[in-house]
Amino acid sequence: MKTIGLLGGMSWESTIPYYRLINEGIKQRLGGLHSAQVLLHSVDFHEIEECQRRGEWDKTGDILAEAALGLQRAGAEGIVLCTNTMHKVADAIESRCTLPFLHIADATGRAITGAGMTRVALLGTRYTMEQDFYRGRLTEQFSINCLIPEADERAKINQIIFEELCLGQFTEASRAYYAQVIARLAEQGAQGVIFGCTEIGLLVPEERSVLPVFDTAAIHAEDAVAFMLS
C-alpha cells in the first residue's frame, strides 16, 4: 500500500469525510483490520480564505506547495488536495512537488464520462463556478459541458458555503435552496450535477437531487484508494 498525503483543512468539515472514505475504501478492498496509510497537513483556512478574497492566489499556491513538500519529506507517495477551489493553484503545487498529484477534476471527469454524460450542472464556490481552471479542464480533457447557476444563485450558493457549510451549519432552508437550483438546471438539460465543493455533499443528500450526483469528495477519495493500492 502506498502512503497518501492529504492537503486538508479547506475546510476541515470536508477533510473528515476524506479520511473516513479512504479508510473505508482500504478496509473494503483489503478486509480485516487493514486501514489507510495517510499523512495529513491541515492548513489554517482563515489564512487561505483571506488570500482568496484578496485575489492573492500566488500566495496560496506557495502555502500549499510548501505543505505538499512537507508531506513528501514525511514519506507521502502521492498528493490529494481535499478541496475543489484550491485546484486553481494545482500547477504551483505540481511544479514544486515531484509526487503524483491526483487532480479532483480528472477523477470527476472520468466518473461523468463513465456514466455516459456530457452535459452536467456545476455547483461550488464562485471561483469554481465562474473561473476556467475547473470547467475548462473538464471541457478540454473530457468534452464535458458544465451548466452553472444564474449570477444571483451563484452568489447565494457561495454565501452558504462560506457562512454556513464551512462552519458546520447545515440548514433545511439551504438544503431546499440547493435542490431548487439543481431542479432548474435539470430543466435546462443537465444530465447530472457536480457537487464541486467538497462541503456540498454534507448538506444535500443524493435523494434530494432530481439529478444523479457526482460528489467530488467521494469520487476523489475513491481515486486515492485506487492509487494507494496500484
UniProtKB/Swiss-Prot annotation:
It catalyses: L-glutamate = D-glutamate; L-aspartate = D-aspartate. Changing residue 197 to S: Loss of racemase activity. One of its GO terms (molecular function) is identical protein binding. It is an enzyme of class 5 (isomerase). The keyword Isomerase applies. Substrate binds at residues 10, 52, 83-85, 198-199. The active site is at residues 83, 197. Its EC number is 5.1.1.13, 5.1.1.3. InterPro entries: Asp/Glu/hydantoin_racemase, Asp/Glu_race, Asp/Glu_racemase_AS_1, Asp/Glu_racemase_AS_2, Asp_race. Homodimer. Belongs to the aspartate/glutamate racemases family. Exhibits racemase activity for both L-glutamate and L-aspartate, but has threefold higher activity for L-glutamate than L-aspartate. Cannot use D-glutamate or D-aspartate as substrate. PANTHER family: ASPARTATE-GLUTAMATE RACEMASE FAMILY, GLUTAMATE RACEMASE. This is L-aspartate/glutamate-specific racemase. It comes from Escherichia coli (strain B / BL21-DE3). The lineage of its organism: Bacteria, Pseudomonadati, Pseudomonadota, Gammaproteobacteria, Enterobacterales.
